[in-house]
Amino acid sequence: MAFQRPYLDAYCTNKHLSLNQHSFKASLGMRVPLLAFFLLYLCSCISVVFAALPITMKAVQVTDPVHFTNDAEFKSSSLHLIGTHKDSLLVDSTVTGLIPALSYSTDVGLAGGLIWSKLSYGQQDPFRQNIAVTALASTKGLAGFNFFLDQPCSFNCVDRLIVNLVGNRFLEDQYYGVFTDQRIELKKNPKRFEYQSFTIKVNLEYRISTNNLAHKNETLFNNLNGFLSTDFQYKTPWNNDDTQLIMLEKPTGYAGAYGFWLGLGGLIDTRDSEFYPRQGWYSKQQVKGSLKSVLSNFTQTLFLSDTRYYQEFKLILPIVFAQRISYQWSNSNANTPYWSYPTLGGEEFLRGYVDNRFLVPQFWATNTELRTWLYESTNYGLKIGGTLFMDSGSFTDGTIASGDWSANVRYTAGFGGLVSLFSPDFILRVDLGFSEEGYGIFFSTGMLF
């Protein structure tokens, strides 16, 4: 959960649905001093069935033992404490978490939120079902709701269904212009960049594994998935006055717009864990498009590329080097709503810039992190860690070959904290990023990538 321009948009239209990277976010704007407190309380109830040896052997056939030996490191002293011994295997368990959150800032006002999540492991890898529900509201008019479902073996045991539903009402949404490459002084007149908006989003992704296909390279095919996706978004600004930038520029979509995208793609995932990867790599490539005649009032084509690499090494403590390289391209033009452009800034890319800072036809971006756990209490299933990160990115309105990429390079850097409570797969994260225009603070659940 976060507060930098309260965003319940866990997935924007032109962003990937990521396995267990689901973040519930908003943020505490970079334009004002930090005047917020964040209160978290987690109530977790876990019922664990300890496996006898025959059951353990059966479970190993359908799960990745490395995932469990790395991530299920609990010490069990009673049924009321969480977990199993380090050499035990979680065969059937359910983790339920409840997080109330309270924050105050001059931008958002007094905001309250609630995250409820349920993670059922079952006898399959990585889990049987992952459900999360988020609600958020503030005294200045923010209201939002988010439902997320990740369901492996939804229709058969080689598929996976991901559903994401978002509805929100903002009184202080952000618009900084389309393809704005000049530095913005946010402190002078921050209200100029704000506007009121209402948004509904529906994201569906259906994945099919190729691990049943006969092929010489069995390792590759066991980690290869193809997928189909559908996305719908409706967004409309409302009741804004002529002093706000969005009403002065009146970009396409300022009076409301909607789009429906169909997509297809493939991904390879060799990570040892989807929640806190230590080794392996991940690559997802996707093409999606909308047609004006099919539930859309504009036509658009998008290409999304996301590749990640993880390597653990030891320097006094075990440290994970994590690297993500992303590229997004669209044929966006004057008929494309401003909110459907690929976007740099905010929590995903260039932490330290505000959300929606750069609305551009195409961009590349990198995230580089060093992650480590600094303290662990096996009695309470508690781990505390930290991160150091550097982000970079660039954008252009030209072609890949002729675009002026070097003139638009941006950098941010920062650090963060990690807390794992009760379950090693439930991680709270806070990032503090710095840019030439200010800073950004992001509270979220799960690793960024």
Protein language model features and the residues they cover:
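Sequence/structural signature of outer-membrane beta-barrel proteins
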Residues: 119-121, 136-142, 154, 168-172, ...
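C-terminal outer-membrane beta-barrel translocator/porin domains of Gram-negative envelope proteins
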Residues: 262-384
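Transmembrane beta-barrel domains of outer membrane proteins
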Residues: 117-119, 150-152, 203-209, 265-269, ...
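Hydrophobic, lipid-facing positions within transmembrane beta-strands of outer-membrane proteins
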Residues: 96-98, 110-114, 143-147, 198-202, ...
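Cleavable N-terminal export/targeting peptides
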Residues: 1-84
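Short loop/turn motifs that connect adjacent beta-strands in outer-membrane beta-barrel proteins
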Residues: 85-94, 121-129, 154-160, 210-225, ...
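Gram-negative/organellar outer-membrane beta-barrel architecture
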Residues: 88-98, 102-254, 258, 427-429, ...
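Outer-membrane beta-barrel transmembrane domain signature
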Residues: 229, 236-260, 316-318, 363, ...
